[in-house]
Curated annotation (Swiss-Prot):
Its cofactor is Mn(2+); Fe(3+). It catalyses: 2 superoxide + 2 H(+) = H2O2 + O2. This is Superoxide dismutase [Mn/Fe]. Destroys superoxide anion radicals which are normally produced within the cells and which are toxic to biological systems. Catalyzes the dismutation of superoxide anion radicals into O2 and H2O2 by successive reduction and oxidation of the transition metal ion at the active site. GO terms for cellular component: cytoplasm. It comes from Staphylococcus saprophyticus subsp. saprophyticus (strain ATCC 15305 / DSM 20229 / NCIMB 8711 / NCTC 7292 / S-41). It comes from the Bacteria. The lineage of its organism: Bacteria, Bacillati, Bacillota, Bacilli, Bacillales. Fe(3+) binds at residues 27, 81, 161, 165.
Length: 199
């Protein structure tokens, strides 16, 4: 069965003014759609067609060598963006078990946000910043390109796309401003759901 571009759970303009409508349209309809198209082309005729994208990305070493790079890049792009859309909401509310755990581990939500923002800003070139569950504990990691923490056995519960295509139309070269705006649209309810499933 072919992989499909998921619908956004909100309108393209729902995250304004933090993430603009034009960026959302291009990011979802063009960038994410291209990852899906190229992923389907790469796995066509293989047994990967019947597997979930999570299973594929978690087991990249078992992907045939001749398509491994295409699957890593485009499969990662599809998985990362599918998760990213769900982690955003126009109705952000900082609450839940995961928020309590963050405060316990970092001392405060602000201290966590500062470390996450620093690592996201320091990610050289294109990539992602993540909050992951690793052996029951929370950890902030970054990955290059479209790599996903699942490949390293870590479960992502919050992710931020720091590719320039995610913010350049509105924020140009001011990645830290985009990262700061991100906190206004985090879907903590979804983060909490993922945390409780992973811990």
């Amino acid at each position: 069965m072919a992989f499909e571009l998921p619908n956004l759970p909100y309108g393209f303009d729902a995250l304004e003014p933090h993430i603009d409508k034009q960026t959302m349209e291009i990011h979802h309809d063009k960038h994410h759609n291209t990852y899906v198209t190229k992923l389907n082309a790469a796995v066509e005729g293989t047994d990967l067609e019947s597997k979930s994208i999570e299973e594929i990305v978690a087991n990249l070493d078992s992907v045939p060598e001749n398509i491994q790079t295409a699957v890593r890049n485009n499969g990662g792009g599809h998985l990362n963006h599918s998760l990213f859309w769900e982690l955003l909401t126009p109705n952000s509310e900082e609450k839940g078990t995961v928020v309590d755990k963050i405060k316990e581990q970092w001392g405060s939500l602000d201290a966590f946000k500062e470390e996450f923002a620093d690592k996201a800003a320091a990610r050289f070139g294109s990539g992602w910043a993540w909050l992951v569950v690793n052996n029951g504990n929370l950890e902030i990691v970054t990955t290059p390109n479209q790599d996903n923490p699942l490949t390293e056995g870590k479960t992502p519960i919050l992710g931020l796309d720091v590719w320039e295509h995610a913010y350049y139309l509105k924020y140009q070269n001011k990645r830290p401003d985009y990262i700061s705006a991100f906190w206004n649209v985090v879907n903590w309810e979804k983060v909490d759901e993922l945390y409780n499933a992973a811990k």
